[in-house]
């Protein structure tokens, strides 16, 4: 089971933890002294019921184990929003293409950062290129 824990210094950065809380209570976990595994981190901002993901990183030893999908599922189940917007890095195109198909999203041929190839919207929403550009600009001005 995935859990997001706010990083201590940044309000937009969250550690991705793999827990086994669904099997044991927190009291039992503390007694057994089981550690939560840190499997990566995610940076995102919420604005007007839209989540803007600026970076999702899963450590290499935990890749290809569907943790990325679990993070997206966690966002859908724990936050109230209309859609997720983000950009696709060249090395993560495969993952985001699968997410777009799985969650009925769409790809847009606009990007803010130089090392990205396009942007995506999950699930499919009517958002103009100007709105996407403004949201990406907003997130980059706050995060970077």
Predicted regions and their residues:
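Conserved N-terminal entry element of GNAT/NAT acetyltransferase domains
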Residues: 1-12, 138-144
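Conserved beta-hairpin
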Residues: 9-40
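Conserved acetyl-CoA-binding loop-helix of GNAT-fold acetyltransferases
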Residues: 58, 64-77
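Conserved GNAT acetyl-CoA-binding A-motif
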Residues: 77-91
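Conserved active-site tyrosine of GNAT-family acetyltransferases
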Residues: 96, 100-101
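C-terminal "cap" of GNAT-fold acetyltransferases
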Residues: 109-144
């Amino acid at each position: 089971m995935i859990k997001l824990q706010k990083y201590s210094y940044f309000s937009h950065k969250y550690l991705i933890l793999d827990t086994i809380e669904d099997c044991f209570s927190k009291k039992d976990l503390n007694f057994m002294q089981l550690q939560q595994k840190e499997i990566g981190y995610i940076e995102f901002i919420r604005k007007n019921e839209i989540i803007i993901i600026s970076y999702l990183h899963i450590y290499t030893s935990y890749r290809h184990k569907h943790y990325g999908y679990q993070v997206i599922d966690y966002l859908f189940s724990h936050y109230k929003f209309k859609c997720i917007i983000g950009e696709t890095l060249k090395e993560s195109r495969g993952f985001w293409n699968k997410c777009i198909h799985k969650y009925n999203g769409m790809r847009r041929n606009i990007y803010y950062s130089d090392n990205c190839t396009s942007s995506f919207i999950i699930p499919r929403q009517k958002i103009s290129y100007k709105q996407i550009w403004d949201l990406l600009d907003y997130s980059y001005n706050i995060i970077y």
